[in-house]
Amino acid sequence: MLLACLLIAPSAFADGDPASDTLLGQNVFYPYSPTATSAQRTLNAETAAAKKAGFPLKVALIQAPTDLGVIPSLFAKPQQYADFLDQEISFKGKQLLLVVMANGYGTEGLPPAATKAAAALRPPSGKTSTELAQAAIGAVAKLASAAGHPIKGVPGVPSSSTSTGSGSSTTPILIGLIVAAVLVAAGLVVLRRRQAVRPAG
């Protein structure tokens, strides 16, 4: 009897974790508390585009302890929950995973550059399901770009240049133009002064 209990306990425990069941067939687990349809649409399209680009990321949004099923003790512990969830969804192969909670993020399976980018992410701006989804939209874009798989063409998703800071490459050009303009202006001033003091005839 004891042996039978030990054998069925792991599967029963897994079934008690809603995200692990959902993520086996979908890219995103949403909290039980409603998430704005627009945010869901954007995040779904973004993760689909990321998968197509070679970055098949699974995302779990955890807004309340009830979203964790039989393991509410892992609420507000995004990395610990990511470690647990990874074991539940990676039995067929390693999965790229992002967990989003109000106090931060947890990750598993990411390449080093994306893991580093995840450590620099700012926590979500709020605690609602929609705010978690909005934070995930920005996070997925940054992680995909850091991993070398930028997401393009998805409305509502930050561009890769915005996500990685590569947009700052225009700064040196602007500085160069300003310096050139200043030098030209200074040259004109000097030329006019020389013409003004030149003896007549």
What are these regions (language model features)?
Residues 1-92, 105-201:
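A structural boundary signal for the start of the first folded domain, especially the loop/turn
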Residues 95:
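Conserved acidic residues
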